[in-house]
């Protein structure tokens, strides 16, 4: 329940807490059709390598052992498609996203890849998932949790829907930790990325928000503490590309 006057950040702006989700939805409605292309352009294709590390860490069964993945904020299906290709006959993924435009792109791509029998798409909110307790073997969220207004609620929901012995994986932008790289990274982020967004999608403002939202996301050790508060054990993280991204991991034991 939102308290009157309660605020949160939308990029560098303070906004009423109950308005952030609408603002985030507007961002992804605007960019859905070019979202994956923009990921390639913004990261120089590196996001593919980061996601491959996530799937390798997930390590889904390659035989017919049943394995249910919940891919939250999975929109266009990229993580689920990668997981499906790395899995055996028992794999099934549910992509849960609050944005209908992103989901529609994902459904179309699942059909194109002949993966619509292994990956389904449902509209839902990370803060109040519609799934039963202890119903999934793994939970993934890639470059999505920083857009959730109440991250603590999303983490508690992730814990709730996971079976005991199952893993939570979160791939998210982080804090550059290589001397000299941070200034170049800031220049690219604040000057180049919004301009790429303007040229490719006609929307520089959405990418300005995305850059700002990265800077507002908690440091890895703070996010690990939030995971522990939600109940996760063995919370840790793996930094990649000089700190540009981190893969966060935790277990429901």
UniProtKB/Swiss-Prot annotation:
It holds the Pfam family Ubie_methyltran. GO terms for molecular function: 2-methoxy-6-polyprenyl-1,4-benzoquinol methyltransferase activity; demethylmenaquinone methyltransferase activity. The keyword RNA-binding does not apply. It is an enzyme of class 2 (transferase). SUPFAM superfamilies: S-adenosyl-L-methionine-dependent methyltransferases (SSF53335). PROSITE patterns: SAM_MT_UBIE (PS51608), UBIE_1 (PS01183), UBIE_2 (PS01184). It catalyses: a 2-demethylmenaquinol + S-adenosyl-L-methionine = a menaquinol + S-adenosyl-L-homocysteine + H(+); a 2-methoxy-6-(all-trans-polyprenyl)benzene-1,4-diol + S-adenosyl-L-methionine = a 5-methoxy-2-methyl-3-(all-trans-polyprenyl)benzene-1,4-diol + S-adenosyl-L-homocysteine + H(+). S-adenosyl-L-methionine binds at residues 76, 97, 125-126. It comes from the Bacteria. Its EC number is 2.1.1.163, 2.1.1.201. Keywords: Menaquinone biosynthesis, Methyltransferase, S-adenosyl-L-methionine, Transferase, Ubiquinone biosynthesis. The keyword rRNA processing does not apply. Pathway: Quinol/quinone metabolism; menaquinone biosynthesis; menaquinol from 1,4-dihydroxy-2-naphthoate: step 2/2; Cofactor biosynthesis; ubiquinone biosynthesis. GO terms for biological process: aerobic respiration; menaquinone biosynthetic process; methylation. Belongs to the class I-like SAM-binding methyltransferase superfamily. MenG/UbiE family. Methyltransferase required for the conversion of demethylmenaquinol (DMKH2) to menaquinol (MKH2) and the conversion of 2-polyprenyl-6-methoxy-1,4-benzoquinol (DDMQH2) to 2-polyprenyl-3-methyl-6-methoxy-1,4-benzoquinol (DMQH2). This is Ubiquinone/menaquinone biosynthesis C-methyltransferase UbiE.
């Amino acid at each position: 329940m939102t308290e009157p006057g309660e605020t949160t950040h939308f990029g560098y702006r303070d906004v009423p807490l109950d308005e952030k989700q609408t603002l985030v939805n507007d961002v992804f409605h605007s960019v859905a059709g070019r979202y994956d292309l923009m990921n390639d352009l913004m990261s120089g294709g590196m996001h593919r390598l980061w996601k491959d590390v996530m799937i390798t860490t997930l390590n889904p069964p390659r035989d017919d052992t049943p394995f249910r993945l919940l891919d939250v904020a999975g929109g266009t299906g990229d993580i689920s498609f990668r997981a499906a290709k790395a899995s055996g006959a028992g794999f099934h993924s549910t992509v849960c996203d609050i944005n209908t435009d992103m989901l529609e792109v994902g459904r179309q791509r699942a059909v194109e890849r002949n993966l619509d029998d292994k990956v389904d798409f449902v509209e839902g909110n990370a803060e109040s998932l519609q799934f039963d307790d202890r119903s999934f073997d793994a939970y993934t969220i890639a470059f999505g949790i920083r857009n959730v207004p109440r991250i603590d609620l999303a983490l508690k929901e992730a814990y709730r829907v996971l079976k005991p012995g199952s893993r939570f994986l979160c791939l998210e932008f982080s804090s550059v930790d290589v001397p000299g790289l941070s200034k170049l990274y800031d220049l690219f982020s604040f000057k180049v990325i919004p301009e790429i967004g303007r040229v490719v999608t006609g929307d520089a403002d959405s990418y300005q928000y995305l850059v700002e939202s990265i800077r507002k996301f908690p440091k890895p050790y703070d996010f690990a503490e939030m995971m522990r508060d939600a109940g996760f054990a063995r919370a840790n993280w793996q930094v990649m590309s000089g700190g540009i991204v981190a893969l966060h991991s935790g277990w429901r034991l």
